[in-house]
A protein has these predicted regions:
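Residues forming the ATP-binding cleft of Hanks-type serine/threonine protein kinase domains
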Residues: 491
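Short hydrophobic beta-strand that contains or immediately precedes a catalytic carboxylate
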Residues: 487-488
Length: 533
């Protein structure tokens, strides 16, 4: 049996050089859990109609600045209204810049390495091995009617799992086990519509993230035949006919876009003038310097080759042609915002917003052509890790409404925040904090695992530290000499182009951030469930 306390003591004694090793060892415990969920979750309360309704709105790959309140060029009137009536956490980050680990972190309130789910290729945890109740199950036990529409992306598995607390569960496509546990699939209920969508996107490449997927088009497929359109329409039908008047509602509406491919209904494309769209700024260098992203290119040839394809295509485009991608990305955000508005209107008509918490977030960001025409995520720079986190609704204290909170915040904070509002037991081991309470994160944490050894981020409003090992995982010894780093002063260098890590002038702040990162890892994994050997 692994002696975790000994590991933590050793890490503190040996300094930050061991922080990466600590987290890797912690990840190995991701499938060792207590025999009884009650050991860490405690008792949950029963339902009651006086509890606030919880409306959880989510997208995929939406940058922190892809909402109108942070970017006047983008049109998201419904999210902007929620921000004016709530609180926007503008320094929030995800816990991993890819779908599966980020979404599991959200649903369990735990870091990806605590769960052992660190990449999109990670296998989903089987139901008997869950560390605690996922968020929908926690709320179901607390007396909520639970309805989930759209993407969860638990991960791949060969074994069937349940709906994990969702009494109603609808998704747009089965997609090789990524959406397990649903009760309604577009594949089964609208195969012709899904086939039409797949025909339109057939040349978009894996994950719809090839060159054609990012160039995008004005879609000729009817809205409902899109996977997000199908999910939205099923959600709106449920809000008309499926609400239980005797129970509070937990509604989860989660879209696949604005993730590429960027095939968007024409009326939303027409909302934008390409002359108003900014061109993406590029760094003063052509080759990625000695960064965790450069090392990722060396070890992951799929990502490196895809970047070469994007670079070859976008470097030959005119300015207006490059802007077209950003326009389609913005239009995607506007389309989803419109669906959110329709859902909120039905909830308001049903009286469900008189006592409600409304949450909006995304799983990670999008590079959108930055750093020499890179797209998707898969790195620890702000365009990839910063996300919109927005709390609105009647339960938000009046003094917070219309405010922007610039304290560090994390995606895992949403689990304890929602649990507190719902009157159920907070997950005691969660690294997250109640965002509506007096939360006091020193910084925000994100981890990135790819083909090589991992990289870890510690971020404050002003500074960002990234530590990584430029060796394949099976070759890394995790000595201090092998650890490399990046340090950025975000206020003067928001694009993160000037690495200050080796600059002696910034040695003091570099070491302070290292200490804070190590403290966060030590405290997090010392509180992790260890199970029986």
């Amino acid at each position: 049996m692994i002696n975790y306390k000994s590991i933590i003591r050793k890490s503190i004694q040996t300094g930050v050089g061991s922080c990466i090793a600590l987290s890797i060892i912690g990840a190995s415990s991701g499938r060792i859990f207590p025999d009884k969920k009650g050991d860490i979750t405690g008792n949950v309360s029963t339902g009651g109609s006086s509890k606030p309704n919880i409306i959880f709105l989510m997208t995929d790959q939406q940058r922190w600045d892809a909402i109108g309140i942070n970017n006047p060029r983008i049109k998201t009137p419904n999210l902007d209204r929620l921000a004016r009536e709530g609180v926007l956490f503008n320094q929030a980050t995800c816990q991993a810049p890819m779908c599966t680990p980020s979404r599991n972190a959200l649903m369990f309130g735990l870091y990806p390495s605590q769960l052992g789910i660190r990449t999109n290729g990670s296998h989903a945890l089987g139901d008997p091995f869950l560390p605690c109740d996922p968020l929908p199950e926690r709320l179901r036990k607390a007396g909520y009617q639970t309805a989930g529409f759209g993407k969860t992306h638990w991960g791949r598995t060969d074994q069937p799992i349940g709906t994990r607390g969702f009494e109603t569960r609808v998704v747009g496509a089965k997609e090789v086990g990524k959406e397990i546990g649903a009760t309604h699939y577009q594949d089964d209920e609208d195969p012709e519509g899904l086939a039409a969508y797949r025909k339109e996107t057939a040349n978009y490449g894996p994950g719809e993230e090839g060159v054609a997927g990012y160039i995008g088009i004005s879609s000729e497929v009817p809205d409902r035949d899109h996977r997000d359109g199908y999910v939205a329409e099923k959600c709106l039908e449920f809000l008309d006919k499926g609400l239980d008047p005797a129970r509070p509602l937990f509604l989860y509406l989660s879209f696949l876009k604005p993730h590429a491919g960027l095939n968007v209904p024409k009326r939303f494309v027409d909302m934008y003038d390409i002359n108003d769209i900014p061109d993406t700024g590029q760094p003063p260098w052509e080759e990625e310097p000695d960064t965790h992203l450069a090392y990722c290119d060396q070890t992951n040839k799929f990502h490196a080759n895809r970047h070469k394809d994007w670079q070859a295509a976008w470097s030959k485009m005119t300015v207006l042609e490059r802007r077209r991608t950003t326009l389609h990305y913005y239009a995607n955000c506007s389309w989803l915002d419109d669906y959110f508005g329709q859902a909120l209107a039905k909830l308001e008509k049903a009286g469900r917003l008189k006592n409600a918490l409304i949450v909006f977030t995304s799983d990670h960001g999008e590079m959108l052509g930055e750093r020499n025409f890179r797209f998707t995520k898969y790195c620890l720079y702000d365009s990839s890790v910063r996300i919109p986190v927005l709390l609105s609704g009647s339960v938000v204290p009046e003094g917070l409404r219309g405010s922007i909170d610039n304290r560090p915040a994390e995606l895992v904070d949403l689990y304890p925040t929602i649990a507190k509002v719902a009157g159920t037991t907070q997950q005691l081991i969660s690294p997250g904090l109640d965002l509506l309470g007096d939360h006091k994160h020193k910084g925000s944490f994100c981890e990135f695992h790819d083909s090589g050894a991992p990289a870890y981020m510690w971020r404050t409003k002003k500074w960002k530290l990234i530590l990584f090992v430029d060796k394949p995982l099976n070759e890394a010894k995790f000595s201090a000499e092998q650890i490399k780093g990046e340090l950025y002063e975000l206020e003067s260098d928001p694009h993160e182009w000037k690495n200050l890590y080796s600059n002696k002038k910034y040695q003091k702040i570099r070491e302070q951030l290292k200490t804070e990162l190590l403290e966060n890892l030590a405290v997090t994994f010392s509180g992790f469930p260890m199970g029986k050997g």
